[in-house]
């Protein structure tokens, strides 16, 4: 069953562009290589926020796929670590209507 997450990050002041580069060149391709589909990504520059929607539709399930992604050598090798840019995050599963 396809599961979709909305991920909303507040980024450290002045670091939004740097985070976007790390996300585009590191996070996104690694996620896609592991079977995730990036439905879209947006910035809200006036609020230093990055919002994206990611889905996964394979038998092992979203949570197992996230665990495998986080433990992957590619993710561990990301430098700078994308989480170092994030001040707060809101991550929720969303359903289509």
Q: Residue ranges of each PLM-predicted region?
A:
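Active-site-flanking beta-strand signature of metal-NTP-handling nucleotidyl enzymes
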Residues: 4-8
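Active-site acidic-Proline motif in GNAT/NAT acetyltransferases
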Residues: 13
